[in-house]
Design a protein with these regions (language model features):
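Ser/Thr/Pro-rich, low-complexity mucin-like regions
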Residues: 13, 66-72, 139-180, 287-294, ...
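Short, compositionally biased P/S/T/A/G/V-rich stretches that sit at domain boundaries
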Residues: 25-58, 71, 200
Length: 309
């Protein structure tokens, strides 16, 4: 009998895992954090009552306010520069009372200073300037209190620029600007409260004992000096009259530029250059009519300065 022998074969597949070696190296690296410049995030010009103002009067205090932001904190702030200048003069013009001012806050010693044009903080009220009371914050206000000169150039339509420049202890800076205008300014003073003449009828070219009347004008534009009378000089008792035209005003005691007075203003000095405390003399003269009743005659004398046009 034939026997068939079957073989059962089992295939055993042995999978071997090969372990590859792992190599590790340190990769050097660095991160550079750049200094972020400070920012002048907002600016304003305000009255001392904290009302926003864009048209300023000379000889009046205003707050020039800048809000400063520093990503670290305000201890990084080194200084703040405030420049005021007419657009006609430009930012880099020399300081002058007419058209350019420079002020500085220095954080290292908390000092407020007028760089120019004044030599003694003439246009900066240092005692009213304000820095933040807490410097650990990232943002707060700095306030310059400025009063512009009486001869500061008047403008319309945003003719002046205020520029705040904020610098930190790394020398990085940011800035912001605001335009504004300056009003016209004129002030007149005279040294006489009255004029007195003792006379007889028929006398001419008589001068008051107070001659000359000294007129002092401060203005930021050219001007005329004008004179007039309220009317004829009228006697207090008999009501007789000395005509206005008998009273004259002149630039000196030799009758230079003399004008006869009326109840309308007449120019005695014309197109005078603007400036501070410009002094001019007025000499008064009277012709006394004949005949004339003996009496005390009075009228009001007027002197004014007006813009030259």
């Amino acid at each position: 009998m034939k026997r068939i022998i079957g073989l059962a074969l089992m295939l055993v597949l042995v999978m071997s895992t090969l372990c590859a070696p792992i190599f590790a190296n340190d990769i050097p690296g660095s991160t550079t954090v750049s200094n972020v410049p400070p920012e002048a995030t907002s600016v304003a010009i305000k009255t001392m009552a904290d009302v926003n103002e864009n048209t300023l009067n000379p000889q009046t205090q205003y707050k020039f306010i800048v809000t400063v932001r520093d990503n670290n904190n305000l201890t990084d702030i080194e200084n703040i520069l405030l420049k005021l200048y007419t657009n006609a003069a430009g930012e880099n013009a020399a300081d002058a009372v007419e058209n350019h001012y420079t002020f500085l806050f220095r954080a290292s010693d908390n000092t407020w200073t007028e760089i120019g044009p004044g030599q003694f903080n003439d246009h900066l009220t240092t005692g009213l300037c304000v820095k933040p009371s807490e410097l650990s914050v990232v943002s707060d206000e700095y306030k310059f209190v400025v009063n512009l000169s009486s001869v500061t150039t008047p403008t319309i339509g945003g003719g002046w620029t205020a520029k705040w420049i904020v610098t930190d202890d790394n020398g990085s800076s940011g800035n912001n600007t605001k335009t504004f205008d300056v009003n016209e300014y004129l002030m007149l003073m005279i040294d006489d409260a009255k004029l007195t003449i003792s006379a007889y009828p028929g006398q001419n070219d008589l001068q008051p004992t107070e001659n000359p009347t000294i007129v002092s004008v401060t203005a930021n534009y050219n001007f005329n000096i004008q004179c007039k009378l309220s009317g004829d000089l009228i006697g207090s008792t008999f009501r007789d009259r000395i005509p206005m035209s008998n009273i004259k005003a002149a630039q000196d005691n030799t009758h230079t530029g003399e004008i006869k007075l009326s109840d309308n203003y007449g120019n005695l000095w014309s197109n005078m250059d603007y400036g501070e405390y410009i002094e001019k003399d007025i000499y008064w003269f009277a012709d006394i009519p004949f005949p004339l009743m003996g009496d005390t005659y009075t009228a009001d004398f007027y002197v004014r300065a007006i813009k030259y046009t």
